[in-house]
Design a protein with these regions (language model features):
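N-terminal active-site segment of His-dependent metallophosphoesterases
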Residues: 33-42, 47-48, 93-186, 457-459
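Active-site glycine-centered loops adjacent to acidic/histidine catalytic or metal-binding residues
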Residues: 137, 175-176, 204-205, 286, ...
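Binuclear metal-dependent phosphoesterase catalytic core
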Residues: 325-409, 444-478
């Protein structure tokens, strides 16, 4: 505890003065209105005083390309009171004062016209190679959890960024940045500011104005005040990035469903019309698209592209495949809601690290407080109550391109069984109505990344796990006799 507090003091943070009485509004956001007079939006996208042609600009409804001089001019009746530039490849991601990406301007809805200037700066190093951190579910609710985020998780983010050594690194907060306490956005912002990289933000179900909203349309007011639009796009190198809001508030207490509104689908259809078929698209959302009610319509829009979907929400890792879409459901920064070191499926508290080279993408899951090589957990025979005669492995980021083998006294054995089962450590920490102490409602979850095998009674075992990219992780163990 003293070391953590020393780190916080060093970084100039003070969790003892949480922003419990208010939240810092950056934008002066106005409530959307269903019917209003159109506003003329005109302006320029420029760099070094020179207009940039063919750059997409949008109000969340209309998508228009700048002309040869970088100018744009359109009438907006969008319900989203922002205009944003779909940042083109080769230009820096500027930051707001709170550390988030700056790519938008608020619109004055009472004015008959708005003049907008987007000034972009070229990157210092080509961004066809770039890296990103995906932070799903930091989900801070109180002072203790803020301290955990700032003193344990954030130093890990910083160290990973240092090791990446990539000037084009950026981050994505993949929703549930806080846990209903929206005033803690300021404390979340302290974490991302400390990383010194720009962060794009995704709205999660716990980031919404549930208590004083009657429809989904106005349920992201506070989020918008801090971070801007809740859906948008941008480009890095050869990759087109999309952020969607797939949390639909029903207007009943905290009730929501996974659903993408027609406004977003119509906007996305127009946005993607300017993207060449066959390109790689990375889409970020909070609720896994696999669980979204109208996902088929989204898959149809994405069908011309090679798509990776990055999501969170479930506090466990899953990989889903739908035609040309690979969805990566990430483990939570907060694990099982800051109750201990792991998520409900046994995945360590952590985040995703993605590296892009041209149109190719590689990734790994980074466990907080562990080396990047920490990719599985071994359990001796007799530990798993359902399989008492087996040794078991939890390989949390496993997908079908991974391989697993083991050596018994130097002899290679390749037979392992993948079984839907719970993780023994999760069972120990989470099972029952009194565990975990901080969140007794958190229960161990059945997962599809548990593996089982049966060694001889007396053996020395080496486990060898290889990921999708040929990286091999080895551990030698001596199981019970």
């Amino acid at each position: 505890m003293e070391n953590r507090r020393a780190f916080i003091k060093k970084m100039g943070w003070a969790t003892g003065s949480l922003s419990l009485l208010g939240t810092t509004s950056l934008l002066g956001w106005q409530n959307p209105v269903l019917w209003r007079k159109p506003t003329r939006v005109k302006g320029k996208v420029a760099s070094n005083k020179k207009g940039l042609p063919k750059v997409a600009v949008s109000d969340g409804e209309t998508v228009i390309l700048t002309d040869k001089n970088g100018n744009f001019d359109f009438w907006s009746s969008s319900q989203q009171p922002f205009v944003f530039v779909s940042l083109p490849a080769g230009y820096q991601i500027d930051q707001l004062a709170n550390g988030s990406a700056s790519f938008f301007k608020p619109l004055d809805l009472k004015s008959p016209s708005n003049e907008i200037l987007f000034q972009l700066k070229p990157v210092q190093q080509r961004d066809d190679k770039h890296s990103l951190l995906i932070l799903a579910d930091p989900q801070i609710q109180n002072e203790y959890e803020v301290e955990q985020l700032l003193s344990i998780s954030t130093p890990d983010f910083i160290q990973t960024i240092k090791e990446l050594n990539d000037p084009n690194t950026f981050g994505v907060g993949c929703g549930d940045l806080v846990y209903d306490q929206l005033q803690l956005f300021d404390d979340y912002n302290q974490s991302i500011k400390a990383t010194n990289i720009p962060f794009f933000q995704v709205v999660g179900n716990h980031d919404m104005d549930y208590l004083d909203s009657r429809t989904d349309q106005v349920s992201t007011r506070t989020f918008n005040n801090h971070f801007g639009p809740s859906y948008y796009s941008f480009n890095r190198g050869e990759i087109h990035y999309i952020v969607l809001d797939d949390v639909f508030f029903t207007g009943v207490k905290r009730e929501y469903i996974g659903y993408i509104t027609e406004n977003q689908l119509a906007w996305l259809e127009e946005d993607l019309s300017y993207i060449e078929a066959g390109r790689t698209v990375i889409l970020c959302a909070h609720i896994p698209i696999f669980h979204v009610k109208n996902k088929a319509h989204l898959y149809e829009l994405l069908s011309p592209f090679k798509t990776h979907i990055l999501s969170g929400h479930t506090h466990r890792i899953n990989h889903y495949f739908e035609e040309n879409c690979h969805e990566h459901v990430l483990g939570a920064v907060c694990g099982a809601w800051w109750s201990g070191p792991i998520c409900v499926d046994g995945t360590p508290n952590g985040y995703g690290v993605y590296q892009v080279n041209g149109s190719d993408l590689s990734w790994y899951y980074k466990s907080v407080g562990k080396d990047k090589s920490h990719q599985f957990r071994f359990y001796e025979r007799g530990i798993h109550p359902e399989f008492p005669n087996s040794c078991s492995l939890n390989i949390w980021n496993w997908d079908s391109k991974w391989s697993v083998c083991w050596y018994e006294n130097g002899e290679r054995k390749s037979h392992v069984r993948r079984v839907n089962a719970t993780d023994p450590l999760s069972t120990k920490l989470h099972m029952g109505n009194k565990l975990p102490e901080r969140r007794p409602w958190a229960e161990p979850a059945v997962t599809d990344h548990m593996f089982f095998f049966e060694p001889s009674d007396v053996s020395n075992i080496t486990i060898e796990v290889t990921d999708s990219f040929g990286n091999t992780f080895v551990e030698t163990v001596s199981p019970n006799k």
